[in-house]
């Protein structure tokens, strides 16, 4: 089985381009290839009821839920907006993601 390739990776700063969290930015915490989804820090918060275990108290906690990968786009800090990316091959053979508009590097 072939692994899926996405335009976002763990640690990238992304902006949500559709849905209830539209126009908000955050850092990608996790990429979920089986669900075609990403988890973004502080966005798409849901409440979960947690049962008490041992010395941990129970109660209602908030955590991030997954967003579909098509609803997020990489955020360029130079352009200050979500952008499409291009893969640029450097002279040493290394691949680097760059902004299509301003040609700046989007690597972490």
Swiss-Prot record:
The keyword Ribonucleoprotein is assigned to this record: yes
One record GO biological process: translation
Molecular function (Gene Ontology), one example: structural constituent of ribosome
GO cellular component: ribonucleoprotein complex; ribosome
SMART domains: KOW
Pfam families, sorted: KOW, ribosomal_L24
CDD domains: KOW_RPL26
SUPFAM superfamilies membership: Translation proteins SH3-like domain
Keywords: Ribonucleoprotein, Ribosomal protein, RNA-binding, rRNA-binding
Subunit structure comment from the entry: Part of the 50S ribosomal subunit.
Family: Belongs to the universal ribosomal protein uL24 family.
Function: One of two assembly initiator proteins, it binds directly to the 5'-end of the 23S rRNA, where it nucleates assembly of the 50S subunit.
Name of the protein: Large ribosomal subunit protein uL24
Organism: Trichlorobacter lovleyi (strain ATCC BAA-1151 / DSM 17278 / SZ)
Name of encoding gene: rplX
């Amino acid at each position: 089985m072939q692994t899926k390739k996405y335009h976002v990776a763990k640690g990238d700063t992304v902006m949500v381009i559709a849905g209830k969290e539209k126009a908000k930015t955050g850092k990608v915490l996790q990429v979920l290839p089986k669900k075609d989804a990403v988890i973004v820090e502080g966005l798409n918060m849901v409440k979960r009821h947690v049962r008490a275990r041992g010395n941990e108290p129970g109660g209602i906690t908030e955590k991030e839920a997954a967003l579909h990968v098509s609803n997020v786009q990489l955020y360029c800090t130079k352009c200050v907006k979500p952008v499409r990316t291009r893969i640029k091959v450097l002279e040493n053979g290394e691949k680097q993601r760059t902004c299509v508009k301003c040609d700046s590097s989007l690597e972490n």
